[in-house]
Structures are given as structure tokens and as C-alpha cells.
């Protein structure tokens, strides 16, 4: 997708949030999460009129919304309905059944890759995509407040260009020339569902009804190209709107563990101070880093984009120990 289109989508999303009055809600969720508050009652926000209408607008701006799932419907079919009907149907799908939310089977499609292989893509039904978008909009600011600054994939106001810029900074300015490269093979297909739910809980997302909905999203049946149906016991569905956010939740512990070895080490944090560079205020930890280099601690920095990450070290010894 061209950069111009990507920027346009981001700006459209912001304008939509302002239009439906959700921007202040998102800011409040971020601030509360940053201060360590818990969130036991999020479903009311997720199923609010403004959040549902915002989700519709955000999905409609994506051309993929016109691709049908197993129910053969797309965003155009929802667009023909009055807003009140859409809102009521979303609420009914999520809470109206005695068995709880049950997403329809996800359509599996194999997408060709440049190397001749294929990548599996899941296409949820459009109503389930709308519900995932409603959930994502509320979860994202809560999770963003807890995510590491060194993660760049599938996050608002961050991109692969930011990851590349950080990489060049570590190589050329910090002179960290020993680099370990990692790519977690089959990561999205092997996410442990139970562990993911525990990680969401530890981030403060403690609405049990919401966690039940997320479990159902993860375990949605998959309709294979040959017509058979599979029932996943692990993994996040590639193609699901909420999947990239959940993947970042899973890898957030890795980010913070590596940060704790150097960037967020107590010695660095205790000697940090604020200073102005040009017009921006930054936190300078250089004094702490100087003291830490006199110890046996490993100097290491991570740059992660989804399941692909690099660890940068000062010397070969630290790289081998890492």
C-alpha cells in the first residue's frame, strides 16, 4: 500500500474518533492504564452507540471490508441498514444468546508469497469484523499505555520507517555494531490462548465478559478451501482485525524483559533526568549507562516489528552471552 494511502487511513481514523466523540474516551483509558488502574467493566464502552458507529466508519474506509466471509456479506450490506438497526444487531450478536457470543466460521484463503509458497489468511464475516473493531478500539489505548517504546509493528503512529530509523540510530550514533536477528517461525499460529488471556488480565483488562468474547474470537471455526472446518486450539487468526494487537500483547513481556536488562534497569532509571533537545523534552539515562558499563551487565537494545526483531549489543562478548 502506498505511503500516502496509509497516512490517509490514519488521519481518517482520527477524524472519525473526533466526530463520534470517542477521542476523549480513548485518552482517558490511556491515562488510567498508565497510572495502573484496572478495567473490570469495558463491555458497556465497547457496545456504546458511538463506539459501534466509529467501528463501522473505520472498517468502511478499508477496501478489504468489501471482501465477503462465509456468510457472503460485506460492508455494503451493513451500510444499507439504519444506524439504530446496526447498533442493535451488534449488541444482540454479542450478548443476545444464552450461549454467549459465537462468531461465524472464518473463511480461509491462501495468499501467494514471492517465494512461491502461500500464506494463510482468515476472512471473518463482516459482522464479526465489526465486533472485533469495537473491541480493538477500546483495548488499544489500554494496551498502548503498557507497551514498550521499542515495539513498532501494528501500532498507531508507528511504522516500519520508525523501526528503520531507530535501527540506524543504534548502529551509527550509539555504535552498537553487534546485532542478533530473530524471526519467530510460525508465531501467529502458535500463540497459547490461555497465556494470552492471563497477559490481558495482567495489563488490567479484567472484564470477564470481554475476555470470554476474546476467547470466542480466538477459537472461531475456520472454513478451509476444501470445505472442511477446523477448530483452532492455539494461534491468533491471521486476517482478524484484533489479531495484531493481541500478538503485541503476547510479545510485550519479551520487550520489557530485554528493556529491563539495560534500558529500564534500576541503575539507569535512578540516574535519569529530563533535558531539552531542540524543542523536545527527553529523558537522559546516559549517566546511568556509564555506571552500568563498569559492571558485568550486558548492554542490549531491542527493535521489534511484529514477530521480527533485532537485539543490538556493544561487543561480541555481550552478543554471545545474550
Show where each model-derived region lies.
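Generic alpha-helical secondary structure
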Residues: 22, 52, 83, 87, ...
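Conserved polymerase palm-domain catalytic core
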Residues: 105, 149-150, 155, 162-322
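Non-catalytic, polymerase-adjacent accessory regions of viral genome-replication enzymes
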Residues: 1-84
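Short beta-strand-to-loop capping motifs
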Residues: 79, 125, 311-315
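Reverse-transcriptase-like RNA-dependent polymerase core
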Residues: 56-59, 91-117, 126, 130-138, ...
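Duplex nucleic acid-engaging cores and interfaces of nucleic-acid transaction enzymes
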Residues: 2, 21, 96, 122, ...
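Amphipathic alpha-helical blocks
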Residues: 65, 77-103
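Short conserved micro-motifs on helix faces and helix-strand junctions that flank
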Residues: 61-68, 73, 125, 180, ...
